[in-house]
């Protein structure tokens, strides 16, 4: 059922949540950069030089401070301080600093600072500069007997412009640009506290819990408060079989509060889950049996307060665990949150003006989810994963354009949210090949068939996705890397015709995403590495979203310091 929700002011609103099948989703093989894991959390190390976060279902770091590490690789020894600084040809600075140290024998500290921005506008378009800043601090202690505590705070500031207007085709005055293509800022302040037992011995009760708080607000008055609580209990015992493979019973509990407003009226939502389970494993199998009960306050009358979904998964290992067959049935609901939506699409319409509505956020509901596939490691050289996914989802979200009339013309550069019921089938493949000790190839492919009930297409969701990353160590000092990202089969719902009192809408196929980057690192010594990156080599002006092209080719250069 496609859904048009109604806001508090009796205006029509389209709304969306989010689910995207991902090739690198659960229990993936070693296909992403690994860092050594100390007893405390590392700050985020991702730096993305693009003008807005394009969340491919196959994400890769364009600039990575750490290299790839396979199962047999020797991990890089962590340093207390890592700093990366560079500049792109579009006045695009990138900066990353992370610190990790043990303040005492039982107290660890992690600090992270990140900045990336671009200050030159895209030719012919409205102002398109952007800036992303982040800061976080984490502490972890194991001072207390049998318990580990961790906590931290963070701050994020993201600035974008609603630049999706071609001024060569639709000239605007400075006043009109300020009104229809304004600057937008999103600020997020948050913190977390975690507790976990350090002992998991047979016959003992283990537990873990996390408390999270997040406050997000934008320039135009939209605000969201979020509180999340997760707590898990587990008891392990040898009720039968091999003493080296005990069984486990457990209970996972969750509670969330989300309060969002774009006006003076606050929309409060509450979500909870209860998930009892039983686990057992042996040399050749693993089995997880559970059931999930969740409840959420409803905005749409058709939505139920309570829902029960399966939580079942298992694996079968053969050939001395070189080959794994896995399958699972899952489901459940997830709150669609303002902070998560604008992180994916920062061009959401949040400014409340006369004759305009604002977005409503519901709960995405996976009524049934199946996943299955095989994983294998061939001769310690090739990691291969083949899988299939199926999702039957209610309140599945899509982005749709909003429009403004300007001097008998139409501007479409902000997005609202639309829900529909969907059935999605995905075929996935991941492979990682390591030849000798110098050449590594990572390949990924996904075919997605998403069928909405009422919408003509699954707006902005790609049918085909692919990735390729090659890393080659020429010698002890010089290394090269190449990344190719591809997406095809994306459609946008756009304005097709209009009169004095109505707008017509129709589908348009977007240009395929083809993004190739070439990079190199030169190790001056153990502390200093110089890097260069040529991004979007083919100078493709593909669109992140309709009317939002990327900048094209750009050259980055800088240094990485470890000390």
Task: Describe each model-derived feature in a short phrase.
Residues 97, 135-137, 191-195, 229-233, ...:
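Membrane-embedded beta-strands of outer-membrane beta-barrel proteins
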């Amino acid at each position: 059922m496609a859904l048009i929700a109604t806001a508090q002011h009796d205006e029509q609103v389209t709304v969306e949540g989010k689910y995207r099948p991902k090739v690198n989703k659960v229990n993936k093989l070693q296909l992403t950069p690994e860092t050594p894991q100390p007893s405390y959390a590392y700050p985020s190390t991702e730096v993305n030089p693009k003008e807005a976060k394009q969340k491919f279902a196959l994400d890769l770091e364009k600039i990575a401070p750490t290299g790839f590490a396979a199962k047999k690789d020797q991990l890089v020894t962590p340093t207390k301080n890592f700093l990366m600084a560079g500049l792109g040809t579009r006045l695009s600075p990138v900066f990353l600093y992370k610190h990790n140290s043990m303040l005492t024998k039982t107290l660890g500290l992690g600090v992270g600072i990140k900045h990336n921005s671009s200050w030159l506008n895209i030719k012919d378009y409205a102002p398109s500069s952007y800036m992303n800043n982040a800061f976080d601090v984490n502490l972890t202690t194991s001072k207390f007997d049998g318990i580990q505590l961790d906590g931290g705070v963070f701050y994020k500031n993201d600035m974008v412009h609603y630049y999706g207007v071609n001024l060569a085709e639709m000239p605007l005055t400075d006043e009109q640009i300020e009104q229809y293509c304004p600057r937008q800022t999103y600020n997020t302040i948050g913190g977390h506290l975690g507790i976990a037992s350090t002992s998991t011995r047979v016959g003992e009760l283990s537990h873990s819990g996390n408390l999270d708080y997040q406050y997000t607000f934008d320039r135009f008055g939209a605000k969201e408060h979020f509180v999340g609580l997760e707590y898990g209990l587990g008891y392990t015992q040898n009720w039968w079989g091999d003493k080296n493979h005990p069984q486990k019973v457990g209970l996972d509990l969750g509670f969330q509060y989300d309060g969002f407003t774009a006006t003076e009226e606050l929309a409060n939502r509450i979500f909870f889950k209860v998930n009892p389970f039983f686990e057992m494993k042996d040399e050749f199998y693993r089995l997880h049996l559970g059931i999930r009960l969740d409840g959420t306050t409803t905005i749409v009358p058709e939505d139920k307060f309570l829902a029960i979904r399966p939580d079942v998964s298992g694996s079968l290992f053969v050939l001395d665990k070189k080959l794994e067959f896995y399958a699972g049935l899952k489901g459940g609901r997830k709150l669609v949150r303002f902070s998560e939506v604008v992180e994916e699409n920062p061009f959401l319409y949040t400014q409340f003006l006369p004759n305009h509505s604002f977005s409503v956020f519901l709960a995405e509901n996976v009524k049934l989810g199946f996943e299955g596939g095989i994983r294998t490691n061939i001769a310690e050289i090739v990691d291969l994963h083949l899988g299939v996914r199926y999702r039957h989802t209610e309140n599945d979200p899509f982005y749709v354009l909003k429009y403004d009339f300007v001097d008998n013309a139409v501007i479409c550069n902000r997005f609202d949210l639309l829900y529909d019921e969907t059935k999605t089938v995905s075929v996935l493949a991941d492979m990682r090949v390591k030849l000798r000790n110098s050449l590594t190839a990572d390949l990924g492919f996904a075919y997605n068939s998403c069928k909405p009930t009422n919408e003509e297409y699954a707006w902005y969701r790609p049918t085909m996705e692919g990735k390729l990353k090659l890393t080659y160590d020429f010698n002890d000092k010089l290394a090269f890397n190449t990344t190719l990202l591809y997406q095809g089969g994306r459609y946008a719902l756009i304005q097709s015709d209009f009169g004095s009192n109505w707008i017509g809408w129709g589908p348009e196929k977007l240009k395929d995403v083809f993004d190739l980057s070439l990079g190199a690192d030169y190790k001056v010594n153990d502390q200093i590495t110089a890097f260069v990156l040529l991004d979007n080599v083919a100078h493709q002006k593909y669109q992140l979203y309709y009317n939002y092209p990327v900048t094209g080719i750009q050259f980055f250069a800088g240094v990485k310091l470890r000390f």
